Structure formats: structure tokens, C-alpha cells
Amino acid sequence: MSDLAREITPVNIEEELKSSYLDYAMSVIVGRALPDVRDGLKPVHRRVLYAMNVLGNDWNKAYKKSARVVGDVIGKYHPHGDSAVYDTIVRMAQPFSLRYMLVDGQGNFGSIDGDSAAAMRYTEIRLAKIAHELMADLEKETVDFVDNYDGTEKIPDVMPTKIPNLLVNGSSGIAVGMATNIPPHNLTEVINGCLAYIDDEDISIEGLMEHIPGPDFPTAAIINGRRGIEEAYRTGRGKVYIRARAEVEVDAKTGRETIIVHEIPYQVNKARLIEKIAELVKEKRVEGISALRDESDKDGMRIVIEVKRDAVGEVVLNNLYSQTQLQVSFGINMVALHHGQPKIMNLKDIIAAFVRHRREVVTRRTIFELRKARDRAHILEALAVALANIDPIIELIRHAPTPAEAKTALVANPWQLGNVAAMLERAGDDAARPEWLEPEFGVRDGLYYLTEQQAQAILDLRLQKLTGLEHEKLLDEYKELLDQIAELLRILGSADRLMEVIREELELVREQFGDKRRTEITANSADINLEDLITQEDVVVTLSHQGYVKYQPLSEYEAQRRGGKGKSAARIKEEDFIDRLLVANTHDHILCFSSRGRVYSMKVYQLPEATRGARGRPIVNLLPLEQDERITAILPVTEFEEGVKVFMATANGTVKKTVLTEFNRLRTAGKVAIKLVDGDELIGVDLTSGEDEVMLFSAEGKVVRFKESSVRAMGCNTTGVRGIRLGEGDKVVSLIVPRGDGAILTATQNGYGKRTAVAEYPTKSRATKGVISIKVTERNGLVVGAVQVDDCDQIMMITDAGTLVRTRVSEISIVGRNTQGVILIRTAEDENVVGLQRVAEPVDEEDLDTIDGSAAEGDDEIAPEVDVDDEPEEE
């Protein structure tokens, strides 16, 4: 076998494809398509600006040929095609592309009509003045430098920018599997937002939006509606509608109307827009236009659309908005590299990252300046000491045979401090002392010991420095350095002073480069949020066995005394009954869990509001349920918070835990919440913290209490684990996550119930048979539900006939676990209790109905406490 053949290594093509494509994807994401959140630049932009900085192609110097810069960039830093680099330069020099141009171009750099820029050999460029703020203090070790592609040059990993460039100029790019599209903003507004964040790091998105109301495009125009902006700033994703600025002018003589367009949306090609309008007129898809012309010139844009006599200008304009790019949507997707990883970021995340970057840059700059100041002060100290001892030093130098021996003698002898003593005493002996200085040098025992560097500086001292004027200048410079060192130490020693410096520099940038907003933001009808028109109130949500859903104000139900007959909650169809009941706020989300283990999401106010006697609407008309699929559990959620879990339990005793955020932003079709085996269904859902305890109650009166931590969090499309070991024919009827002390109220089919302290229920292991929760007999019937209550609470019970009663919890006695309970609601023959719900809102005494709560003899008695041996636990 040849040498070449021995170098061939067989590889699995599938593994090689995975590895190579992943490498390619990460290279595109990190090295090409996405900007860094700190400086808002992609690598190619950063390399172009750095190359121009190295060339000295500054804003106040002569222009240089674009080809010269492109050659430096591709030769030293960016080993790609010259067209990619030149296109980047062109875009940074176009006033209609960047809100604040980073390159000052001379020549033809294209137009808003889509005209191409002239070749790079014809155009000339230099850095814009604002671009220097991106690279300010670059030479002061403020950022890390990394090797270029071949290791022959160093380039900055990120720019030490004073400008929040990611927001100010925005960014767009398509990577592998992700993309970014960040709109530009007004510099003054963004800096105001940064200052507000510096003042209060806990500021909300709404608070930041008081300073940054929305994007500010270089082409001005109008943003139609605020809702997309709010969503984008809150979540990192959103959509805004940009509309051209147009007005309808009326000729005073003829009465004819003319539409004048002064500004068009961002990234819209004006020439193509005019072609599209002409095409629509030709195809008669837009009526009422008699003439179209472009009168734009160096003074501004002006597109003239003449309207026919019998047409209405506003109607024609609205048609153009809907059918042309006079109105476009801008999809905001704020993805940037954060710590080297792509991340979708909201407005506060981006500002926080920039301020954090500035804190690091200013700290590193201060350390650098302190080191340089101390090094300079170290030399000035020696010169001041030399001037204080000028005669003996001159004598020593005159008698030294060589400069080397003179230096050695200067280092060996101690010297009087002279004027330096007072200055060092005021500033502190160690203030100007370099960190590298050994202890034997400097001030010791009232004398000054020179280092070799200081001795050399004395030998290099020119004779003119011995004049009185030069002596004073030297001492003044030394005093200024001591003051500078003191200030630098104060910055490093005080976080508040550090933030003051950052604030002062941001205010200076705002003063120098800030301007007025160009883009107007207007409200539109779509901004009238239905939710804003809905009064926040607590309501009762009911779901019948046959799937009829509705909500009613909680205030419609008056609390009644125990044993009352209740009021009708719903007009029920024959053979139907209410089996799901909860109290929620009209603005809450409702997570609807179905018999097939899927979950759907709605707002409470989207449910039908009905009177007490109405059935409501079939939930199949509100949710895309499949045939034979029904809602078996509903859960109100106010906010989808991080760290909160959704705990689920099924009738067969299976339990499962999933993070709440898995259920945010559900699609209309819903998603799988839990995989169910045949014959099982979901009976209970609750929110947990991850460290709670869980109680499962069965129809036969058993309960198991165990720690939630024994169930690990799982994804949506999983089955879960066993929570309780059930007897034959038994099923789980309630899931409770006990919070605080309180008591557990258990209700049975025949209207009986009782309260038992939570502490009475022992904590056992998961997947055991549990202990007795209530004594189940023929008299009280099987358990239909259990809830945790406090003395100030009320409960609502509902029967399969639709009767609902609301009762004070305080009227129900607290007894042990092994009892039957008392009558909570009187049921008619063949009527069973099917639902139980806690109400945590007290009602004034004036609003209560006085209903005789006395019971027939024996009915109200609490079954005596009976010693019942709990069944042994089974692991």
C-alpha cells in the first residue's frame, strides 16, 4: 500500500455529515451572520472598522480609496471575497441603510432606487466621526485581542464602544437554523434608556419604553401601531407595520386631489415601488389614478400620484397601502451573540449587556491608565528628588568614570525627599507606587532610594530642566499625576463612581451625536386591545359533562349557611351535569387539559359569559377537539413564570411534573401534555414550586401524601410515574398541593363532608396505598373531591342536577381523618354531588341569605372517631 493510501482513514458518512455540518453552522452563526450584543457588530463590520483605524483613515483626515481598505481587510483580517467586504463598506456609508453612518463615503454609493454603488476603485472613504466612539480607548487594553485567520495579526474580539450600537443601528442576518432582524433606534432615546437602567437596574420593560418608544428608521416614515413594538421589547420577537408618509393635497381651483409621498418604509426600493403602482393601475387592480411620477431630488423625496376627478384620494391611498410596499411589515427578531452563544434577547437584556460591557471597558481602561500614571509618576518622583539634591548628584556624576557606574552610584545612595515629601504625605506614600516596585526602593526611613529606571531618567535629564521654570513645570505635572491617580483609585474602589463615569460618557455622546426622532409612531385601531376593555373581576367558570362552558361573575353567588338548598348554576340538558368548576380572573389564561392528554390555551374572557340559568356554549366550538375528546381538567394561570411546575394526576394514579413555560404560547391546535394509557384520564392539575408536597385522594377514601421532589420534571410527550397504588375499582378524584396549615375539606356523593387538619395527613413515599382520608359508607357515598381551605374561605358544591350552594368553611367542624362528616348540601333522590371548589373571597354579612341550616335528627351528627388501622405502605 502506498504512503497516500495509508493516510486514508475510513469514516462513517453519517457521523461525518453531522460533525461537518455542525462545524459549518457554528462558523456561520458565530463568525459571520450574528452580531455581538456588546458592540452590535458582525465580524466583517468589526474588521473593516479596525482596518480603517489602523490605516489612520480618520474622520478629520483625507479620504482613501475604498480598494485600499478592502485590500487591507481581506489580506489581514477577513479571508473572503472582496465583494462581500465592499458591500459591507457601501452599506455603512448609505444614509438610507444605517441610522447613524459609520463610514463617510465620497462618490457613488448607490441610491434608495436600488442603483448599485460605483466600483471600489472609484469611491473613497474614511471613518465617520461617530465610528471613533466605537473604537475609543482601543489602545488602552480595554478589550481582548485575538489572532487573525493565519496568526500573523491581532484583531479586537469586540469593540470598546461608547454607543449601544446594536439598538442604534440595528442588524440583520440569516444564519443556519436562526436569523436576526433588529431595527435601528434613535441614539438620544437609547442613551436615555441606558441612563434609566443605570439609575434603576430593576426597571421594567414598560419603564424603558418611556425612554425608548420604538424603532427610528433612517428613511423616517410612520410606524402604524404600538402592539408589535411592545411584544418585541418584551419577548424579543414581534412585528411592526411601517407606513409611508403621504398626504392628500386638493387643488383649490380644480378640486382634484393629489397624493404626495414624502417618506417610504425602511428597506423599500423606491423605483420598484413606483413600478408596482404602475403595474396595479395597468391591471386595473387599483382604480382612480390618472398619473404617477417621481419628483425626488437632492432636497428630498416626492412621489406624486394624481387622482381622477371621480375618485377619493384617501380611498386610493388606503388601497395602495394594502397592495403595495407603501405599507410593509417589519419582523423583529432580536437574536445576538451573548457570551459567544446565540440568544433571543428583549430590550432590557440588550441594554443590560451593553452597560455591563461598558463597566468592564471602563474598569480595564482605568487599570491601564493607573499603571501608566504610576509609571510616569515614578520617573517624575526621581526627577523631583534629583532637583532637590542637584548639587551632590552633579558632583557624583562628574566623578563617575562611566555612565554605568554613575547609575550604580545613584541607586546605591539614599537621597533627601525635598518637596516630594509634602506631596507624598498628602497623596499617600503608596498612591503613586508601581505594583512591580520592590520594597527596598522608594521612600524608606525618611529617605528616597532610586531604582535603575529612575537613575537612567536622571542621567537623561537635559540641563535646561534645571531652570526654575522647568523645575516648577515638573512639580506641577507630578501634582497633577497624583490627583489623577487618586481619582483612578476612587473609580476602582467605588462601584457608584464607576457608574458615574459611564453616565458622564454616555451623556457626552448624546450631546455630541444625538438628534431628533425621524419615525413617527401612531396608534391604530388594532392597538385597541380587547383585553384592555374587559374589566378584571373574579368569575366562576363551569364546564358540564357534555362539554358546555361559560363563566359568571362570582358576585352572583351569595354565601349560604350549611345545609341550604342552593341556587341553580346552570340550565342543564337532560342527562348532562356540571363536572368542572373553578374560580378565576377574567384576564387569566385557562389551560384546558383533555381526556386524550392534550392541552389548549384560552383567556377567560374568551369564554362565553352567560346568566345563571343559561347552558353556555359547547367547548368544541371554542377549541379544536377531535371526536370523542373532551376537556377533563382546567387550570387558571396568571403568569407563565420561570421555575413554576405543572403537576398532573390521572384517574389511574399516574403523576407527572412539567415546567409551566412548556405551555406558554400554545398554538391553536394545542400540544401533548401527558401520554395516557387506554382507559385513563387526567383528573387534576396544579402549579408547584418544585419543592412542594402532593396529596392524591381516591374515591374509596384513601389518600397518599408525598414530596414533589420524588417526581422529576419531564417533557410534554411522556407518560409519568405512579403516584398512588389503587385498589381494584378505585380511582383518584382529587389532587391537592397543600400550602400552609389550614385543613382539607372532603366531600362525598351524598352531600356529606368534613374538615381535617393538614397535619393529620402523614407524609409517606410515592406509589404506596396511602392512609384513610374519610370513612366511606353507604350513608355518605364515595368521595367526589377534596380541597384545602382556611376558616375565612367558602366552598361551592354542585350537583349533577345543576344545583350549586356556597357555604362558609367556618360552619363545618374540624374532625379527624377516620370520620364520615356532616351534611353540606341536601340532595334530592337520585341527585349526586359532582363538584367542589374553594372560594377565597369573603362576603359581607348584609349580602348573605339567611337559610335554615338545621338538619333532621341524626343527619347532622358527626360520626364518632373510630380507630381504624391504616393499611401498611407498599413501596
From Swiss-Prot:
Compartments annotated for it: namely: Cytoplasm
Any one GO molecular-function label of the UniProt entry: identical protein binding
How its function is modulated: the record gives: Gyrase is the target of many classes of inhibitors, including coumarins, cyclothialidines, pyrrolopyrimidines, pyrazolthiazoles and (fluoro)quinolones. Quinolones bind GyrA when the enzyme is complexed with DNA and trap the enzyme in a covalent reaction intermediate with DNA. Coumarins bind to GyrB and are competitive inhibitors of its ATPase activity. Cyclothialidines also bind GyrB and are ATPase competitive inhibitors; they seem to act differently from coumarins. Pyrrolopyrimidines inhibit both GyrB and its paralog in topoisomerase IV (parE).
CC terms in the record's Gene Ontology section? chromosome; cytoplasm; cytosol; DNA topoisomerase type II (double strand cut, ATP-hydrolyzing) complex; membrane
This enzyme catalyses: ATP-dependent breakage, passage and rejoining of double-stranded DNA
Q: What is the top-level taxon of the source organism?
A: Bacteria
Know the name of this protein? Answer: DNA gyrase subunit A
Please tell me the species this chain comes from.
Escherichia coli (strain K12)
Gene field: gyrA
